[in-house]
Regions:
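Phosphate-binding site recognition
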Residues: 1-152, 157
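Cytosolic catalytic cores of cyclic-nucleotide second-messenger enzymes
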Residues: 160
Length: 160
């Protein structure tokens, strides 16, 4: 695997005490979802992924009260997967498609049982639909395509 700066950032984020949700933004098709899946596979025993474009009905997880207990009950019912406290990564992909999920992050982070990563490529498009931004509950990370310099460095070391 081509080592990416984003992966190193994910590891650092995971090891941060009292971590916030990690919001990864960037252009489409640059590997955001791939790197998050790879990271989850190597660092967590449980991984739950919700893609709000391919599964628009997942938005119903956030119907009703936006408190952590209700959301986690709905999430477990929707995914039919167990949640292991302290060893589960919950990944909301294309979060711009579910403004309620973006609002709810603050309650989930406050609950502190699980780690959360959000990603999206068009986050600014629906910004007016988010009722309350999770200011202070998200760490933002901007991911970029692999640069020629980065690719060339790996090539000269025989890592490709």
């Amino acid at each position: 695997m081509l080592q990416r700066k984003a992966y190193e950032h994910l590891v650092k984020w995971k090891n941060t005490p009292d971590k916030k949700a990690l919001l990864i933004t960037g252009a489409r098709q640059i590997g955001k979802t791939y790197i998050i899946r790879k990271f989850a596979e190597e660092n967590y025993s449980n991984f739950i992924e919700i893609n709000f474009i391919t599964n628009p009905d997942a938005a119903k997880i956030f119907n009703g009260d936006l408190n952590a207990e209700t959301i986690l009950i709905n999430l477990t019912a929707y995914t039919q997967k167990p949640l292991v406290k302290g060893d589960t990564l919950i990944f909301f992909d294309e979060i711009q498609e579910c403004p309620s999920a973006r609002t709810a992050i603050k309650f989930l982070v406050d609950d502190g049982q699980f780690d959360y990563i959000e990603s999206g490529s068009l986050l600014g498009v629906r910004y007016k639909e988010v009722k309350s931004y999770p200011v202070g509950y998200e760490e933002n990370y901007r991911m970029y395509p692999v640069s020629y310099t980065h690719l060339r460095a790996h090539e000269t070391r025989g890592n490709l």
